[in-house]
């Protein structure tokens, strides 16, 4: 595949491998990051059971890691200053913490400005306040859980995050401070917001992300659903090794218990680092003991059902974490090797060579203004202006310096809005302005081909997609349980 910009190298996965924490302010403009990389899904839950709907259902309304990703806030209004003169009051109690009216109104103002800058409809104020209050409650519950779990964020951690944000925006730290001041956000408050994001990111990683696994069977099913030559990596063959502690058919309960105890002792030795093959040669009662217990490569359908179920999702070198019982006795199992039978090294995938021009929307550029600019630029390109020169001059994507070139891309690498519009174009044709969560794009298809893509790369891609889906589902379940277990007392009507 052709060399790509940093943006598109990141976009080879359909979603980020990690989404960091809840934002303590709904921030506005995407000033850095991959223009085509699908943003993290919103991480909110409505009240106690259902995912939050409305203003937070799209990625850029409440981005999951806006501060750490490099997003800077838009300009503030005078309402916050005027509000500081008002007497504050508690609107909700979350376990032992409180949420104040000033905090609620400030956050609602920020979300409202965000939506306006993106040319999106702003909900009725009462609905907006209700959703924002639920978001603040979720943030409180997570922060409390993180602190109770002993998770801490040092000043040095925050310093590194500040430096990273500045670098992503091509700013020095002092310039970043100036930008924050212009937006009306105090630097100390910005640091605390960053600290909160890091705290919640670490909590999520420990409680959710690190516990999610993707199994080979899931990858096979995913690829099969995609169809085509990439549907599967072939029939899997497994080489399983066993240590058998035999049990006679007429063995007493005591004899069976003793055999199980011996097998469990052998399993503990293996888990402790003992050489499996040596233990098999010394202790196994199976015919293949002299070969280190290895049964040899065979399709999973030719393995005993108990063995197949136990090893199907293991990686080579892993040991089944419990003793398996069969009519022959008790087995300690290890997956020695797994490979696809007769698998082609590569498979054909339809690829598109594409380039684009991006204009980002934000507080200084509405979607309508961006659309008008791109429409005028498209007219010039259609009448002879070089697309690459236009991209270098006007595009705000990291691919601009390469004339907007994204190289050869495979299905699923780019965000759906972009990919759908790209699929309708003929080579050489330039799209009308296309909107995504990153802004508006002009897209030009340069060519199409059937490419040989390594099967292992397809499987890596499938793994990342499946993991992202499972992580998101697990996170939503975990967050819902966390919310349900919290004691929340509303001091005012949430719709006020």
From Swiss-Prot:
Q: Which residues form the signal peptide?
A: 1-42
This protein's major location comes to periplasm
Note down the stretches annotated as region Disordered: 53-80
What reactions does this protein catalyze? [protein]-peptidylproline (omega=180) = [protein]-peptidylproline (omega=0)
Subcellular localization(s) per the UniProt record: Periplasm
EC number per UniProt: 5.2.1.8
Any idea what this protein is called?
Answer: Chaperone SurA
The UniProt gene name for this protein comes to: surA
